Amino acid sequence: MGTSGVRFLTLVKPFMFALPEVSSATKKIPVNEKLLWTSIVVFLYLVCCQIPLYGITNTKSSDPFYWMRVILASNKGTLMELGISPIVTSGLVMQLLAGSKIIDVDQGTKEDKTLFQGAQKLLGILITIGESVAYVLSGMYGDVKDLGAGNAILIIVQLFTSGIIVICLDELLQKGYGIGSAISLFIATNVCESIVWKSFSPTTINTGRGTEFEGALVALFQLMITKTDKVRALQEAFYRQNLPNVTNLLATVLVFVLVVYFQGFQVELPITPAKSKGMAGQFYPIKLFYTSNMPIILQTALVSNLYFISQILYKRYPENIIIHILGRWEEPEMSVSGQMRPVGGIAYYISPLNSFAEIVSDPVHALLYIIFILASCALFSKTWIQVSGTSASDVSKQLRDQQMVMKGFRASSMQRELNRYIPTAAAFGGMCIGALSIVADFMGAIGSGTGILLAVTTIYQSWETILLAVTTIYQSWETIRKESRDTDALKMFG
C-alpha cells in the first residue's frame, strides 16, 4: 500500500509545472499589509458574487444547492456559482485517502508535502471542470439545446476561470500574504452578509398574510407602527413563518456568544527547555476546538455533493426506487424561495430541522440527524489532524525541534503523553462543533447553525492573529526603546 501511495504522488509530478501557483513570501509580511491583502481578497470575492454569468437563459430553475449556498460561499447565476465547493471537496477526498492510508504521504518530508498539495490542487481543478460541465448539462441555466453549443462552452469557461481564481486567492492567503484562509473568509463574509440582509432587508414579499418586509427588524417596526393590537404585532414579528423573524435573530446572537465563550476552553500542557530543566517553562495549549472549523466544513462538502447528486437524479428518474433511497424532493407549501426540499431518503434524514416543533413532529429524523452530525464531525476532526500536521507525532516533533519537552517527561515518551490529549481533544472538539451547529439549527438561527459557527470561528481566529501581531510589534518596540534608553545612559556616564 505504501508503494502504491508513492506511485500516486509520483504521477502528480508531470503536472506540477502547469498548476497555477502563488509564490511564497520571501520576507515576513507586516500585519497592515496582511490586512490590505485580506481586504483585496474579500473585495474580489464580493465583486465576483455580483457579476452574472454571460449566456444563461434561465435563472429561475430549482437550485440543488439553495440550502447550502451560505456555507459554500456561492451565489447562484454569478461567477461565484461554484463558491468554495471544488476546494473543499478536493480537500475532503485527499484527506480521506491519506487518513485511510490508501495513499502514502509523509507530511514530514518537503517533497511529499509539496506533491500532496499539488495533488489536492489538481483534483480541485478537475472537480471545477466536472462541476462546471454538470451544472450546464443538468439544465440549471436552461436547456442545453436552447443555450446552444457556444453559450454552453462560454458558461463552462466562466465557471472554470472563476474556480481557478478562488483556488489562487486561497493559496495567496495560505502562503502568508493575508490572514486565515480564503475558504473560511468567504464563508464568514457570506454568512455576515446573509445575517445583515435578513435583519434589515427592505424587500417586500407577498405571503398569505399579505405584503411583508423580508428583514426581521424592518418587519418588527412596520408591524408595531401599522398594527393597532401591539401584542399581536409583537407575536407576529417574533414567530412569523417562512420569513426571518426576531426569534431567529436573537437565536443567532445567542449562538455567536456561545461559540465565542467556548473558544476560550483549553488544556495547557507545561513544557520546559530540554537542556535547562530548572528554568521557568511555558505552556502548550490544546484548545477545545483543536481542529477549528474544519470538521464542519468537510461535513458540509460531503452533504452538499450528496444533495446535488440526489436532486439531479430525482429530477431525471422520479419513479426509481433506488433514487428514492438516496433522496426524494418536493417544493414545500407557502415557499417564498421556490426551492426543493428533501422529504425522504438519506438526503432527508441528514438535513437540519429548523425548529423544536419539527423535532417533536419527527423525532426519528431529529435523532438520525444528531447522530450523523456528531459522528461525522468527530471522524473528520480525528482524520484532519493526521494530514494537517497537528497530530501527536507532529506536535512532538515540533517541540523536539524547538528543544522543548513536556514537564516531567523525557523526549522519547512525549509523543505517548500527547496521544492521551490530542486525539481526544480533536474528536471531542469536533463533536462540540457539531453539537453547537445542531443547537443553532434547532433554534432557527439565521444563516444556518453551520454557517454561524464557521463565521464566528473565522472572525475569532482572525482577531487572535491580529492581536498577536500587534502585541509582538508593541513588545519589539518596547525592547528597542529600552535598549536605546540604556545606550543613552551609558553614553551619559561613560
From Swiss-Prot:
Q: Which residues cross the membrane?
A: 36-56, 79-99, 122-142, 147-167, 177-197, 249-269, 294-314, 359-379, 426-446, 450-470
Among the Pfam families in the record, one is: SecY
The subcellular location is:
Endoplasmic reticulum membrane
Q: Which InterPro entries match?
A: SecY/SEC61-alpha (IPR002208), SecY_CS (IPR030659), SecY_dom_sf (IPR023201), Translocon_Sec61/SecY_plug_dom (IPR019561)
Please classify the protein's predominant subcellular localization into one broad category.
endoplasmic reticulum
Q: How does it sit in the membrane?
A: Multi-pass membrane protein
Domain of life assignment: Eukaryota
Keyword terms of this UniProt record = Endoplasmic reticulum, Membrane, Protein transport, Translocation, Transmembrane, Transmembrane helix, Transport
A biological process (GO) of this protein is: protein transport
Q: Which GO terms describe its cellular component?
A: endoplasmic reticulum membrane
Q: What does this protein do?
A: Appears to play a crucial role in the insertion of secretory and membrane polypeptides into the ER. It is required for assembly of membrane and secretory proteins.
| Homology family | Belongs to the SecY/SEC61-alpha family.
Subunit annotation? Heterotrimeric complex composed of SEC61-alpha, SEC61-beta and SEC61-gamma.
Its protein name is Protein transport protein Sec61 subunit alpha
